Amino acid sequence: MKLNLLLLLAFLSTTTIFNLKAQSTFKLKETGYVGALSANATADWTTGWTNFDPKNAVYGAPTDTTTLNGMLSTLTVIGEKDITTTVTLDATKVYLLKGFVVVRSGGKLIIPEGTVIRAQSDLNSTPKNYASLVVERGGKIEITGTSTKPVVITSAKAVGQRERGDWGGLLIAGKAPHNLLDGTTNNNVQMEGFNNVTFDANLAKFGGTDANDNSGIVRYLRLEFGGLAFEVNKEINGLTLGGVGAGTELNHVQVSFANDDSFEWFGGNVNSTHLIAWKGTDDDFDTDNGYSGLNQFGIGVRDSVYYDGTYAAASSPSTSEGFESDNEATGTANVTPYTSAVFSNYTMIGPVPVGAKYADINSVTKAAFRRGARIRRNSSQRIVNSIFMGYRNFVMIDGDSSVRNTNYPSALTLVTPSTAVDVKSKQISFANNLIVNTTSAYTTAGDTTANGLIEVARATGSNAKLTALDAWLRQTGVLANKIDPVAFTAGTVLVEPLASSTAPNFRPVAGSPALSGANFKDNPVLNNLFTDTKEIKAAQVAPIYPNPITNGSLFFGRQVVSYGIFDMSGRLVKHGFDTDQAEINNLTKGLYFVKLDGKVQKLIVQ
């Protein structure tokens, strides 16, 4: 035994000589509270770097008008400026962003703490000035703001003149999998709006097979007034992530006044923490085409003044949601990877102000804003340990494929096929959430599709589905949601969650139901996605094989709901769902811990 231990220690001591490959350093943190914040003021992660009144923020005039200027007449292709080497910005300067600035494969853009970039677009120029920052596959961006010196990318307009859509946005294209097809592959799908960029037909294509792909670091960043409409009804999101892999670091990002979605993921599996969507236009957090990352601690706040103007369009109307999630466009194709992202500890504030009723808001707001979460088109989205308040309806399970993904017995009898999804890892999870305001939300006599809590698609049998899914959300037990435990009035849940405030406070008040109710260990989706040092110390050898392993597949010997692989500090470096194996080709040599069915086993990669 002593000899084996010495050999193990000797092996571990040699692992430091190998070059580190990019891999996820994400770890879910177990909390007792639900929502984004605890009651502890000193632990308020929104302090120092956020700005909830960017229309009136004072920023310096640009002092560098060339480094990030894609409209210079001296460029080979006017309209875009390529970064092919390492370019490091200087935080003592204020940069003007015009045209596309494109970080090509092999290039790197480093934006240090405290840097301010002011963006100016012009779709009437020739060529068009799209004022956007694009990171291509193989390129890297390193945004390294801090809690006291964030990086800010904002409008170039003056105080009081800034508005949604003043510039494009930040778009990152990675090599991770998604479920869109481009002919026979999924490696060259182009982001929306770029197909008619006349001077570069191949810009912003994403996808590949590297789930651990590394596009860089995005840390302590504010994105303000993005969402330029490249074409009619084709606005750019505040932050767009296409096929971005788990090797990318993403945390502490505030998107304010986006002219489309604040955040949107197209496939990929990048993990994140501490995201804020402030007064966006369409959806706060939109997941599509096989996105399967883990996300913890986030805030979404709606203002009734800002909504998607196509809500009443005769063709393809779009309403503004908190979460919107799709697997693929039809909702019927069984394409993989599945959209199965996890969002835990989110605080979602709808357009109905605290103390008001849905009936009190104007008719346009009633029509434009709909749900706290819309899960549709065969998505398996998971939203847990979160707060929802002030919405018209709180959850919509839209379409039979997503109704089936609930695996709720009385709902399964109403869809075809009526069998449960193959394994529970494809099952939607909406559990341990605090939901406030259903009794004063949307109600209308005789409506068979919505009741203020749950909504279903308008179709044959909608009333039966509504009844079944209402029961699904009201299940009791360790995964129960708290529904209307307190009145929707000031001082019952959060300190100051109003969108009208320029200094909101999303911490729970004394006695708030948000102070408790989170559950990680009993949720079959979550219980393999976090660990602690006690579990690592108590790890016992179990029959995963081969072990040790050099590369290829690690086999579990059975199908598992989910798995997590952790490094020695307890950081989650790889995870997956609905599988009997894990690919470990991109793991650095060393000692790891694999968690299956709530139990931890040692793994050596050599």
Language-model features, listed with the residues they occupy:
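Bacterial Sec-dependent N-terminal signal peptides
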Residues: 1-24, 531-533, 555, 591-600
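N-terminal cationic amphipathic segment used for targeting or macromolecule association
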Residues: 8-12, 20, 117, 536-540, ...
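N-terminal compositionally biased, intrinsically disordered segments and leader/signal-like regions
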Residues: 15-17, 86, 532-534, 551, ...
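Short, solvent-exposed coil/turn segments
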Residues: 21, 82, 90, 96, ...
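Residue-level recognition of short loop/turn positions
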Residues: 21, 513, 569-571
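Beta-strand/loop edge motif enriched in small/polar residues
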Residues: 23-530
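C-terminal outer-membrane/trafficking sorting elements
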Residues: 536-606
